[in-house]
Amino acid sequence: MSNFVAEKSIAAVRAVDEVRDGMLVGLGTGSTAAYAVKSLSERIKHGLRITAVATSQATEALALRLAVPLVPFQQLSAVDLTIDGADEIDDRFQAIKGGGGALLREKITESASTRVIIIADSSKLVAQLGKFPLPVEVVPFATEFVRARLSALGARVTVREAGGTPFLTDQGNYILDAALDEIPRPREIAAAITTIPGVLEHGLFLDEIDTIMIARGDMVEVRHRGEA
């Protein structure tokens, strides 16, 4: 097991320690979030009583396989706690997410959550966002139009593919990966992208995150929004 893989697991275990009986828990998507689902499953085996909501079909399949009880988000208006990973996160609790292709459902679920914990290995904490391409979910009809608008913002844009064809999100949409190299003013970029017709969501998470748990070796650094 590589250091980064071990760190993901350690951070996940620490985050799942925050889950209490009776909670409705949001389950993120991606390799790091999968460790949280596995850790949650172990706690359920030892008597923890919770229900969960998945942010993707992939996470739903994993949760069902591990006997984590699920409810559909369509029946919900609020979530107690969501645990998820990030592709990049900075000291201001701003993150790029969507490498796993579930940014729209993640944004909805985390906006509905009383608390959001982001777990990550030490490589994900950055001084400035932007080295990881910014995912943008788009209506397929608007792909080339949105690509041109993103290019006008200075991005190098590619259509995400899987098996030689465009990757489809769980909603049947496309993802454009916008490489910007650096994003010194994330709110300006987020606002500009949001105004483009055909864009459904972008992967900048600027206000949703409450707690960051970054694993470094065998230790987990916990940071809370608003702390000095």
From Swiss-Prot:
Biochemical pathway: Carbohydrate degradation; pentose phosphate pathway; D-ribose 5-phosphate from D-ribulose 5-phosphate (non-oxidative stage): step 1/1
Residues binding substrate, per UniProt: 29-32, 84-87, 97-100, 124
Cellular component GO terms, alphabetical: cytosol
E.C. no: 5.3.1.6
Disulfide bonds listed in the record: none
Cited CDD domains: RPI_A
UniProt GO BP: D-ribose metabolic process; pentose-phosphate shunt, non-oxidative branch
Protein name: Ribose-5-phosphate isomerase A
Annotated source species: Sphingopyxis alaskensis (strain DSM 13593 / LMG 18877 / RB2256)
The encoding gene: rpiA
